[in-house]
């Protein structure tokens, strides 16, 4: 009779540890993606100054790709010890909407860069930055 109880306890411990490990992995992955996103924003600024629209396009594509999957990197319970505000999970639809706004802003930048219109691309970059800032204000602790 004790054997199934012990087995159940061991299974629960293993499952709990694997969840903890998965959570730690997703946190590290999302931090790496946010750092890459920040590097892309800096690269876009420099490329735009040089009217290097190919780089603007490729870096904005990276941002758009990250925005599409960003919410997947915030599973329930992955906020402990991070700068992620609880609002991410209490307003997950709003968080997903913010990621979608970021995606659309990146797509607008891609469209402007493909036209090789520096003025329009500059406006699109500012709009993209505004989506980052809005999300950070609502969902990130500083």
Q: Where do the protein language model's features map onto the residues?
A:
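Bacterial N-terminal signal peptides that target proteins for export
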Residues: 1-10
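Hydrophobic alpha-helical segments, especially transmembrane helices
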Residues: 3-4, 31, 137
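Compositionally biased non-globular segments, especially hydrophobic aliphatic-rich helices
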Residues: 11-16, 102
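N-terminal signal peptide c-region/cleavage motif recognized by signal peptidases
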Residues: 16-23
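Processing junctions and N-termini across compartments
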Residues: 18, 126-129
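Extracytoplasmic c-type cytochrome modules immediately beyond a signal peptide or single-pass transmembrane anchor
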Residues: 24-127
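The canonical Cys-X-X-Cys-His
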Residues: 128-140
